């Protein structure tokens, strides 16, 4: 890990836009991002994590989100981000045992702009308080939530991050319903809310109905937006679907939504999904 940190630090030092970007005046209060990082154990040839990790670092350095949720991240990928971005901290657990094993649906935040108040994780199953697989899911699935405070405005907000099942349609429907009900339970004071994640469903899926009665898709409401697919599959196969989302509620405006298709260094893709971000105003 020390070697990776040194390599990435050297790469980041030569990025021409870093110093100028830091001086730009923000026209928003909060920048949030969702990033399916692609599991670090996957055998993807030259797109495998062992080759593309510098692109992840360059993307985070370029985008500078205040808060972002990752999906499919293994413990060593979480530690890589922590080691290379000391301004950020994170919360989350491995879905397999509630500790470090398996994929993490972690939440990262910039400690200079955001303060974390409290957090928790629940499993998308009939027994959400313990590691478990629900309904017809192929895998254990979790949602991580955090109550946070924006340091500039003093505003409180909730951030929730999840990854719905890729096979079980009932697990996706029930899992999303569970998230909606938990949101209602957790957010008793009606704070602004952000939900990020890979939902493994298209925008017209009926399973989104309950969620859309409470929250809005940043992609749909932002005046500056795009309709780009979020799944790229490394440029192979059918990659024209939107399955990654940012939903929001309680903010006065969502000024921008963007699918991050930029190329970083020698890498065309930072994952088999494109990251997405939204800029929000309290």
Residue ranges and their predicted role:
Residues 34-54, 100, 124-138, 165-168, ...:
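Acidic/histidine-rich helix-loop elements
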Residues 2-3, 19-84, 97-102, 177, ...:
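N-terminal, active-site-proximal structural segment of metallo-dependent hydrolase catalytic domains
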